[in-house]
Swiss-Prot record:
Record localization: Plastid, Chloroplast thylakoid membrane
Coiled coil spans: none
Annotated organism of origin: Adiantum capillus-veneris
A Gene Ontology biological process term: photosynthesis, light reaction
One Pfam family cited in the UniProt record for this chain: Ndh2_N
GO molecular function: NADH dehydrogenase (ubiquinone) activity; quinone binding
Gene: ndhB
Entry EC no(s): 7.1.1.-
Segments passing through the bilayer: 18-38, 51-71, 87-107, 111-131, 134-154, 168-188, 211-231, 244-264, 278-298, 306-326, 337-357, 379-399, 411-431, 470-490
Protein name stated in the entry: NAD(P)H-quinone oxidoreductase subunit 2, chloroplastic
Quaternary structure (record): NDH is composed of at least 16 different subunits, 5 of which are encoded in the nucleus.
NCBIfam families linked: NDH_I_N
Chief localisation class: plastid
Amino acid sequence: MNDINLFLAKLTYTSAKLTILPEIILILGLVAVVVIDLLSKGKNTFLLYKISMVTLLASAVILLWQWGFFTAYERSHARDFGNIFRFFLLICSLLSISSSVDYILCSKMSLAEFLLFKLAAGLGGMVLSCANDLVTIYVSLEFLALSSCFLSGYTKRDMRSNEATMKFLLMSGASSSLLLYGFSLLYGLSGGQLQLDKIVDGIIFNRYGSIIYLSAAFTTAGTAFKLSLFPFHQWTPDVYEGSPTPVVAFFSVTSKVAALALFTRLFGLIFPYFSNEWHVAVGLLATFSMILGNLIAVTQRSVKRMLAFSSISQIGYIMIGVLSADSGNGYASMITYTFIYILMNLGTFACITLFGLRTGTDNIRDYAGLYMKDPVLTFSLVLCLLSLGGMPPLSGFFGKLYLFWHGWKAGLYSLVLVALVTSVISIYYYLKIIKLMFTGKSGRSDTPLNSRQNSLVSLSISISKNSLEIAMIICALASTLSGIFIDPIIEITRNTFF
């Protein structure tokens, strides 16, 4: 009996120390999806969906257990930061898969391929969030980017989707090239080091200061592409509009969260002694992102293009949290608002996915009179849009309040003032949709777009009758309730300064 207890204790300790166990579980899930799809010849779709959800849940549970173990025995701020973003990526994958199944079945596409690429993208993002060397960072970033690119072109017969894929692939390749060149400069300046902490030691007393600035510039440009920061945002509206809506929902949060973790780790660990210089540069990018994103979003007629420009402005707000980090609060304001943004954005995209399945359109004018047809969808979309706009008492308001207050304390007065003004502008185009849903007259019937979708409704019901509605309601409620429980969230995210 004592031997069994000793064995179990050793197994528990070994599992807790194996920090990549959540990623290993995801890899096993990937293999299981591929093997079962081959054996069943694509017929057992419910089992594939079930395996994906169980894999993500198991990975999240293991991650939380390991996090609690390390918190109790060996505290590490860098590990806390990585674990938070790994958990965020698992949440993104869970909610996006549950809100995508109906769409994929109605599109008559292979569910196995879709789940494979989503799990692969989540895996790449998780590895990227805690990577400590340049090689792992680059490989995991490309893994995430290629998986997202394949998802973007998932509907192969759609010309808009093919165009979006080509733009995404070209721009992603260009940004990766810039980032790789920045890494090569860091590698040379540090004397051939790959580990981030050793690179810092190698460049502190380096005499080639101008090359260090050049490396920081290329690194900023490469990560700004992934974040859709001005002026590296040009690909975002076209890719958002052309890609399938559930795919846009997925990489609008997944790629942003992973790239944000990368940006923060690189500049927080490698360039802390040049903070004045890169703070000015990133502050300018954030300012123009907030102004441009909100002003152009006002003029859009497509909901997906509007949300694309909205996401550009949102990442500008989040940059305030990155620039205002300190040893007392860490990156608490940035992480807190990122978590709230995930819920708001996924909830909004779940609503427009459901609307698109019924009408086949994403034109803002077609939302007229939606309240009379589907009150649940209408109120869910209202909650998510108002939260994105920062209206009280929703979570977006409390997230922005904490973010802007933290930025004001850090002396980022001009950035905070711009953020406040542009937040007011954003409320206008969100309220425009809300007003249309309640007061407009609809001329479009609330039925699926074509007979092919009609024939697949029964198949969709057998697999995931309410998965999209459930994901939509969960995100809508979370967009409200997470603001009420914001204090515990802030407390968890405080010890994250490198």
